[in-house]
């Protein structure tokens, strides 16, 4: 599996690091947006990127303040500019783009894509908070400690900025995603962002939409780490349904590629 390092710049001067898995031969890419303290460089996200690559290319990114990206993390206040820069990079290379966001990365994805729903074909929000203020991180519980310890992989970490900046609320942005297909995924044992967040977001979003509750599932990328096959199958199924072009579209895209 080919993997090449790329860097894009935001409109406010941040350099965003991303890894491109694939060769761009089939016109479809999926952007992976990790959450707070996580990085595309951890073993979990590298394995996930390789597991999802094949049918389409994968662009795994790091938000500001994470990994090799510059800047300080603002807890979803300014990270929309990071995703917009990656979307701009993808749009000149691919006809069809999907986005998979985790935790605060999912919140950023909802907030950002809702401003340009026509630029994305499919969205998956994993363990997304409906609002930043209502995240109920029960850090003192054994489950939270287990999840936190598992997340301390090499490559994880954050350079935090001001957490008090005004933030968009995904619960208010979700209705603006229409007609973009969106899949919400959440575990019932998520003690960082409770499952009710995805239930509220699902209720607020318009069709086409789907809510997948994973019984006994933990938080965000832990859903992949704990059961890679189930998570990959779920994500691949949704992306195949929403990203694969219709037969007539395939003919048009083949003609367009011949003209280039």
Model-found features: residue ranges?
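Catalytic nucleophile-loop/oxyanion-hole region of alpha/beta-hydrolase
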Residues: 66-93
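Conserved alpha/beta-hydrolase "acid-adjacent" motif
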Residues: 191-197
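The serine-hydrolase catalytic nucleophile loop
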Residues: 36-49
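Hydrolase active-site cap/lid region
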Residues: 114-163, 175, 180
């Amino acid at each position: 599996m080919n993997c090449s390092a790329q860097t894009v710049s935001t409109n406010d001067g941040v350099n965003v690091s991303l890894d491109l898995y694939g060769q761009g031969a089939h016109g479809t890419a999926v952007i992976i947006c990790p959450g707070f303290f996580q990085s595309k460089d951890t073993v979990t996200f590298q394995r996930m990127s390789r597991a999802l690559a094949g049918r389409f290319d994968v662009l795994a990114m790091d938000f500001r303040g994470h990994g090799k990206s510059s800047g300080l993390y603002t807890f979803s206040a300014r990270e929309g500019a990071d995703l917009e820069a990656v979307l701009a990079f993808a749009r000149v290379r691919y006809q069809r783009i999907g986005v998979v966001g985790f935790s605060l990365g999912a919140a950023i994805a909802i907030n950002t894509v809702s401003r340009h729903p026509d630029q994305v074909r499919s969205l998956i929000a994993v363990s997304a908070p409906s609002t930043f203020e209502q995240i109920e991180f029960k850090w003192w519980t054994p489950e939270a400690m287990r999840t936190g310890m598992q997340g301390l992989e090499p490559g994880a970490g954050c350079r935090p900025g001001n957490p008090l900046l005004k933030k968009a609320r995904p619960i208010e942005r979700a209705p603006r995603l229409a007609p973009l297909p969106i899949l919400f995924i959440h575990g019932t044992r998520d003690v960082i962002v409770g499952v009710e967040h995805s239930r509220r977001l699902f209720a607020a979003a318009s069709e086409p939409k789907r809510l997948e509750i994973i019984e006994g599932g933990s938080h965000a990328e832990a859903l992949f780490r704990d059961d890679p096959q189930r998570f990959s199958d779920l994500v691949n199924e949704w992306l195949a349904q929403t990203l694969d072009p219709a037969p007539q579209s395939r003919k048009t895209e083949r003609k367009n590629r011949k003209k280039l």
